[in-house]
Design a protein with these regions (language model features):
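Short loop/turn elements at secondary-structure junctions
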Residues: 1-28, 155, 159-218
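Long alpha-helical scaffolds
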Residues: 33-34, 119, 159, 185
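Surface-exposed interaction regions enriched in Ser/Thr/Asp/Glu
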Residues: 54-55, 90-117, 121, 125
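Residue-level marker of positions within ordered structural domains that often coincide
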Residues: 79, 124, 162
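Alpha-helix boundary/N-cap detector
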Residues: 107-114, 118, 148, 152, ...
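Short amphipathic alpha-helical segments and their helix-coil junctions
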Residues: 112-147
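Short, surface-exposed, charged amphipathic helix/loop patches that serve as local interaction elements
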Residues: 140-148, 152, 161-165
Length: 218
């Protein structure tokens, strides 16, 4: 499964999508036995590895006394029962930021991984690289810098989620949000410019531009 963005990227724009607007059929793990100390979140009855929880994911946590109630970034999966979590960071290379310590935590880890995978496929199709274009001699692993694609992917994912929510509730606000993020996606895709290592030598051989969707030899 390919992907240019993750759930933590979406969290920066729309935290509500991991709260009351989460998709119940895309919950990876949920229970009521969580404990949080510093940046270490533990749940004795969990198996985060089998649940396929990944770094870059998002966990919603609420303590029994209500002192903790929010969504946080998953920095790493340290064992089957332990995660390193953080208040959302501006840069994934920054040190984790501790949420308020608490116990008796109800938690839920939901994902938009399937939507991110679909967005990535559509982007590779648009830019003419595999897997979107199976006939291409350039694979997604040959892309050297994916930051521009990440931004476009985030907007595409959020737009698709709000379209799905609008279809279920007929809420005009959801439709408006979907259209808003669709416009952001189209602009971000048009501005995309990234390098491709077509020769597998670690050097940029080709530049892709969203304005044309065509290859430009360097």
């Amino acid at each position: 499964m390919i992907g240019f963005s993750n759930d933590a990227d979406i969290l920066k724009y729309e935290p509500m999508l991991f709260g009351e607007l989460h998709l119940p059929w895309q919950v990876l793990a949920a229970a009521t036995d969580g404990t949080l100390s510093g940046t270490t979140f533990s749940a004795a009855g969990a198996d985060f590895v089998i649940a396929q929880v990944l770094a870059g994911g998002v966990v919603y946590m609420r303590s029994g006394d209500g002192s903790l109630d929010g969504v946080y970034e998953i920095v790493s999966v340290d064992s089957a029962t332990e995660l390193t979590v953080s208040v959302i960071r501006s840069d994934s290379d920054d040190d984790p930021i501790s949420p308020p310590a608490s116990d008796d935590i109800s938690y839920r880890i939901s994902t938009f991984g399937p939507q991110a995978s679909e967005a990535a496929f559509q982007l590779t199709e648009y830019f003419g690289i595999r897997p979107g274009n199976p006939a291409s001699d350039i694979d997604v692993e040959n892309v050297l810098d994916t930051q521009a694609l990440r931004r476009a992917s985030v907007f595409a994912v959020i737009s698709s989620i709000y379209a799905m929510l609008a279809g279920k509730s007929k809420d005009e606000n959801f439709w408006n949000k979907s259209l808003y993020y669709q416009r952001l996606f189209e602009r971000a895709r048009e501005r995309c410019r990234f390098s491709v290592d077509a020769g597998s030598d670690g050097l940029a051989d080709v530049t892709k531009s969203g304005a044309s969707g065509k290859l430009v030899r360097d």
